[in-house]
Amino acid sequence: MNPFRWSFRAQFLLGFLACAGLLAYAIYVQLHLGLEPCPLCIFQRIAFAALAMFFLLGALHGPRAAAGRKVYGVLSFIAAGVGMGIAARHVWVQIRPKDMMSSCGPPLSFLSETMGPFEVFRTVLTGTGDCGNIDWRFLGLSMPMWSMVWFVGLALWALYAGFKARRSSVHH
C-alpha cells in the first residue's frame, strides 16, 4: 500500500488523521504528563486544527476537478505555512541565549480578556518567557522542533496530493 498512489480523498484523510493524532498527543501531554502549553504552543495547536480542517474538508469533498484539488492543496499549504512560522519563532525563542530572555507576560486567557485578537497575537509572538523552556525532548528535538518537522512534512504532502496528476476514472 503505497500512500503516494492513493486517491486524493485517501491522501487527504491521511493528512487529517496525522493532524488529529498530533493534537491528541498534545492534549495527552498536557492532561496526563502535566506539561502546560505556552501561548506559542497554543497557536501551533490552532494551526494544526486549521490544517486538519482543510484536510478533512478536502477528503469529504473529494473534488474530481484538478482545480478543486489544487485549491485544497493550497489552503492546506497556507495553514501549514502559518504553523511553520509560529513553530520557527518558538524554536528561535528556545535556542537563543538565556540572558536574552524577557518575560513572557500574563497568561493567554488574561490577554484575550484585555486585548483585541491582533494585539494578543502580536504580544504572544513577542513574548519569550515560558516559551523558551524546553520541558520535553524526543530524539534530541523539542516539541516545537517536532511541530516544525510535521508542518513541513504535511505542507509538502498537501501540495503533492493537491497537484498530483490523476488519471480520469472515465473510460472511453
Swiss-Prot record:
One Pfam family in the UniProt entry: DsbB
Statement: the UniProt record of this protein carries the keyword NAD:
no
Give the GO terms filed under biological process for this record.
protein folding
Q: Give the primary localization class.
A: membrane
Residues spanning the membrane: 12-28, 47-63, 71-88, 146-164
Cystine pairs annotated here are: C38-C41, C104-C131
Q: Which InterPro entries match?
A: DiS_bond_form_DsbB/BdbC, Disulphide_bond_form_DsbB, DsbB, DsbB-like_sf
What's this protein's family per the entry? Belongs to the DsbB family.
**Function as written in the Swiss-Prot or TrEMBL entry:** Required for disulfide bond formation in some periplasmic proteins. Acts by oxidizing the DsbA protein.
Protein name per Swiss-Prot or TrEMBL:
Disulfide bond formation protein B
Source species of the chain: Xanthomonas euvesicatoria pv. vesicatoria (strain 85-10)
